[in-house]
Amino acid sequence: MIWVAVVITMLLFILVAKPTGIYLEKAFQGSKKLDKVFGPFEKLIFKITGVKEYNQTWKQYALSLVLLNGFMIVVVYFIFRLQGVLPLNPAHIEGMEPTLAFNTAISFMADTNLQHYSGENGLSYLSQLIGITFLMFAAPATTLALVMAFIRGLAGKELGNFFVDFTRALTRVFLPIAFIAALVFVALGVPQTLDGAVTAQTIDGAKQSILRGPVASFISIKELGNNGGGFFGANSTHPFENPGQMSNILQMMLMMLLPTALPFTYGRMVGNKKQGRILFVSLFMVFLLGFITITTSELHGNPALNGMGIEHVQGSTEGKEVRFGTVFSSLYATVTTAAETGAVNTMHDTLTPIGGLVPLVNMMLNTVYGGVGAGFVNIIMYAIIAVFISGLMVGRTPEFLGKKIEGKEMKLIAVTILFHPLLILGFSALALSTSLGTDAISHSGFHGLTQVVYEYTSSAANNGSGFEGLADNTPFWNITTGLVMFLGRYFSLITMLAVAASLKEKTVVPETVGTFRTDNSLFGGIFIGTIVIVGALTFFPMLVLGPIAEFLTLK
């Protein structure tokens, strides 16, 4: 029965992807029906804020994005610092320590939601609502806006205006869908209140303080925007965030909704729907491979315990919630790292070595399917690399969407693809070379190395999940992961926008018999191979020293 539920869940991922992709294309490219519904409200926003609806250059678009995001980081930073004297603080929580506030503000603006604090004890209701939830809308709206400009550039059209796209992302996508999802979560038992904690009497007569809050509205945008941060420290293992299997499936659907839709949006916007389908199917195959790998490993149980003859019919149940079970915990772990959300319904630090390898690889690749917007930019980056390699092998100038890929584009892409592992491996090496980093490790040996690398991989990929055995709420970890999150977020977005702007100016080369097609299964295979090979070449030595070595040791 459990496998039937898994298949149905997978089918739901597939069935909603194309309709959502079509809706996104209409929402941003203009639709009379949508303009009639949302247009008056949007024009009012533009009038109040002084936004002019004109086409920007890629530099203007990128500058607008960085300045708006930077302003939001500063505002939210001071909310966190001053929350102790601000209203909506029934628990009288004090202001955040400076480096923690720095880390948290960047974390949520970068759509990472790395949390070096426990949500219910670290933030007031005001900080949760005005700080965290606000950024949970703004962060994915930023990247969804940028990916639309990116696709327009690839299609040879004007990039558009960042502030217009940002507003439309909020009004036409995130606010309405999150509102509906929040109502469903309330119906499923997720609390939504501004009242303080409830004191309950337990069976043995003791008193227990039960924390609550505006959780349902928080969870809806947490998953839809691929944010992932928890209202509670236990994240989606907490029964108030994720009461049962229905809420569990809904959360996974929300996580996958926009990332899986974007290939279809892209196909419609560039006039090649088949290429969009090829990208979707290719990535889904990689996703399935990851799910099969982690599930097989978790169902086989812990190798060390198996050697003692201990029964493991339920698989490795350490760190998992009984109400979700091993299979759906494995699926959730695959989804949350494939869609770069970072929400967890099981503790990733307790996964088996190979089970923990899958989330790590998903984040290292950062392209299956990746988070809202940012992940799709990486998908196209790998697609262009696949075309470039294919062109070199047959001695032709590589072309993508009928435009020649030349030195300028490849230099930008080369720098972008190297920057991600440089952040992960460079900062991991720094942490391992000083006691400021190693003192946080709770496990010696290979697993301790994986804890460190996982933290920086999660930060660079804007995922936010963690091997929580790492004691990371220290100035060193707050500052270094904050820098990694900021650089990992904005560097690739800006460089790839420059690539799209460069391709926009090029003329379309007529298709000939020798043109390498990017809308067939051959390209899909080369595309997958490029992702796997580039990822393996870059990160394989670290994976051998971490989870693979741990697995062999336990065996």
UniProtKB/Swiss-Prot annotation:
InterPro entries for this protein: KdpA (IPR004623)
Superkingdom of origin: Bacteria
Membrane topology type: Multi-pass membrane protein
Subcellular location: Cell membrane
Pfam families reported for this sequence: KdpA (PF03814)
Keywords on record: Cell membrane, Ion transport, Membrane, Potassium, Potassium transport, Transmembrane, Transmembrane helix, Transport
A cellular component annotation (GO) from this entry: plasma membrane
Ranges that cross the membrane: 2-22, 60-80, 130-150, 173-193, 246-266, 278-298, 374-394, 412-432, 483-503, 525-545
A GO MF term: P-type potassium transmembrane transporter activity
Coiled coil: none
Protein's job: Part of the high-affinity ATP-driven potassium transport (or Kdp) system, which catalyzes the hydrolysis of ATP coupled with the electrogenic transport of potassium into the cytoplasm. This subunit binds the extracellular potassium ions and delivers the ions to the membrane domain of KdpB through an intramembrane tunnel.
The family this protein is said to belong to: Belongs to the KdpA family.
Subunit structure as annotated in this protein's UniProt entry: The system is composed of three essential subunits: KdpA, KdpB and KdpC.
The protein's name: Potassium-transporting ATPase potassium-binding subunit
Species assigned in the record: Bacillus cereus (strain 03BB102)
Originating gene: kdpA
